[in-house]
Amino acid sequence: NEPLMTNPRVPFVLADQRPKLAPPDGKPLIVHFVVNIESWPFDSPPPRKILTGPHGVETLPDVPNFSWAEYGLRAGMPRLFKIARDRNLPTSAFLNAGAIDDYPSVAQAVKDMEWEVVGHGLKQKAVGDDEDEAALLKLCLDKIETFYGKRPRGWLGPGLRETNDTPDILASEGVDYICDWVLDDLPHWMTTKHGPVICMPYTLELNDSPMFAIQNQSSADYYQRYKDTVETFEKEFDNNPRILTIATHPHLMGVPHRIGYLEKLIDELLARDDTIFMTGSQIADWFIAADKAAT
């Protein structure tokens, strides 16, 4: 087989040449507030590290890095819950299905707050070559549906990772939108063997995981990046609305020295008259209707 030299699922188009979409409620800045809720296996290498092993020797269990993640669930999640609760924020939980059993009080709080639940794998681990991906994805979606009473409409792979089959499997399981393909500031249609699904904007540039765990940015840098992004988006509203994703992880954004910057950012966005907060499904429904009206 010849190598694919272009995107096999989302046709290429310049952002400023897309059909004009009517903004939701006349508000061109669409904010998607996301809380990633993950289950890191205790007996496996962690997905990310805050501390390397002494003398470069890594050991299992990796107690400090596992504890870093669990601190987020124990102490960081209450802070994120409070931000959303106090402001009545529409929120999407990108949930490892394994967290339902591993962290039942967190899973129940998400249910009580009526957050949208988006599939995010079973544990925070990409699908292995030796695994039955179709069975694993079905298990994740079924598990969430059983606990929350609603099948997830959206999906983000652990680490945004996929195989060549992932979108086809997700479409066959009824998933409407996929967040792994971070390639535009508005949704696109993605082709699958089972019909089109929505390629939903997410974020890497404004994601607390690469910013803090990889790039070692400061909290002030995080806040300024959002301010600078919105300033650019404002110049583009005449062309089309823009989606601003606030992607958080409790062990990163839920720590005491960062949470205040998140509160400040959200409060400033809430004070704008051109801004609307929406869940992933609300954005998907808006896009379906707006795209149909524009074509």
Feature-to-residue mapping (PLM):
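Active-site-proximal beta-alpha loop/turn segments in soluble metabolic enzymes
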Residues: S209-F212, A247-H251
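A structural motif
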Residues: T192-P210
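Catalytic alpha-helical scaffold of carbohydrate-active enzymes acting on polysaccharides/glycoconjugates
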Residues: E2-I198, Y223-I246, L252-T295
